Amino acid sequence: SRGKPSQEQLDLSMGMMDVLSSYSDLACEDGTDCRNYGVLDGIQEAKVLIGDMIECNPENIIIYGNSSLNIMYDTISRSMTHGVMGNTPWCKLDKVKFLCPVPGYDRHFAITEYFGIEMINVPMLPTGPDMDMVEDLVSKDEAIKGIWCVPKYSNPQGITYSDETVRRFARLKPAAKDFRIYWDNAYCVHHLYDMDQD
């Protein structure tokens, strides 16, 4: 598969393999034994660590596995079968549409294709998706249920959404009550250059 780190890159993290041993304290502050299944929303210490990294309150964080693509798939699958926040399950609707910034991440598009969701191309600009088009489409069509977003270093162009683009996403007024922004911020801390993190 593509995008896998090289052996040299993997070797950079070898020191982490020696941090824990059979003598390590593997209990959380709340008493949870980290060797066991844990809790549904994730280990509190991990939530605090990630919260500090992304400037988010740990109470608003859920820790999943290491694949954002799995999270996206599971979220779409659940929306199809159970709906979003009490709304009609998408599988019971005549039409479900999704906005797809292009060029974009083909594996996001594969998820929508798998579930038979109609994809609407939205051109990428140097600042992110064409927000004039996004605002117009979502405000007029309640069949549009979401948009795929990779806001930092978006594949394949490496575009990072501008602050204004992010603000416009926050101000969207979608016709669909169950419209969601699928914000796959997988590269939020993976900067290539110390001095250029946009």
Language-model features: where?
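Walker B catalytic acidic pair
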Residues: 184-185
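Glycine-rich phosphate-binding segment of PLP-dependent enzymes
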Residues: 2-37
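Conserved core of the PLP fold type I
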Residues: 23-26, 30-177, 188-197
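Pocket-edge structural micro-motifs
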Residues: 1-2, 65
